[in-house]
Amino acid sequence: MKVLHDEKRILTINPGSTSTKIGVFHNERSIFEKTLRHNIEELQRFDRIIDQYEFRKNHILETLHEQGINISKFDAVCARGGLLRPIEGGTYVVNDEMIEDLKSGYAGQHASNLGGIIAREIADGLNIPSYIVDPVVVDEMSVLAKVSGMPEIERKSIFHALNQKAVARKAAASLGKRYENMKMIITHMGGGITIGVHDRGRVVDVNNGLHGEGPFSPERAGTVPAGDLVDLCFSGEYTKEEIMKKLVGTGGLLGYLGTNDAVKVEQMIQGGDEKARFIYDAMAYQVAKEIGAASAALKGEVEAIVLTGGLAYGKSFVSAIRSYIDWISDVLVYPGENELQSLAQGALRVLQGEEQSKQYRIE
């Protein structure tokens, strides 16, 4: 009889704008992780982000060689997914159609587009599979949830899919259940804040944490009064880019307090800064209110609420949110995020036969 759970060795790749994080995992256990920093001058040699893939791939292979890691022992390479067409969650084989969309920048140019391309190149050379897991374009929203109130605008699913899904599985396991059988609310709280309604393995509703929807966050404005925003847009004082920056980049804590660092805000509060306390409380209030709305989407059948991301390290912040929502359901806290491990887990589920890999299709 074939043993499904023999040890697998997985290379994980997470490209950022000026760095590439890599990890080598034995099943879920990390045996090597490193952030490869890329010199700005080196990157500026390339006209497009996508042209960096050979340079970054070589940097990864050189680093593994220096560490004495035998790449011929890898069972799979798994990368952070890029800006693709909307797809349901899961672990996807990096196929020709995906490479085509990543290289052409179908849904935009972003460093994460390099992940699948590099993974495929390394994996093909070793004759092993390459995957991506739960990219930001995961879209499982119900048709009802996509209605905005204006026929010209449809609500979009853009959220921290990789961490939300990984943490949801972890929470389900801690409760002795399967993610695919649970109804839960996952709240990722980092530079952006997204609250996902997880209904038996699918995120059927979630706020767009990038382009101004939901609670304000350390550097994003979230939902703001629409009429007043229109007035700002047509005041003649701001360009389109400046308005977008107010929504994403200089909004939220940064706009009110001059910093997007939650640790610094907590220090300001401890030092007696009443404005900092007030704004921090307002952010907790908005997060809690959005969680309340998410519970209505599940008709109150909420088996767990999970708080995750960098802000979940803030004990006073978490405590403030709990005070509003602990009547709804049990609140579990998993601070931070581990994208490399989440990628390894996604590949492992397929390698061990717990899940089927999915195929990306251009229709």
UniProtKB/Swiss-Prot annotation:
Cellular component terms, GO, for this chain's entry? Answer: cytoplasm
Endpoints of the signal sequence: none
Which reaction does this enzyme catalyse, per its entry? butanoate + ATP = butanoyl phosphate + ADP
Alphabetical keyword list: ATP-binding, Cytoplasm, Kinase, Nucleotide-binding, Transferase
Identify the domain of life: Bacteria
One GO biological process term is:
acetate metabolic process
Keyword Lipid biosynthesis attached:
no
Record-given protein name: Probable butyrate kinase
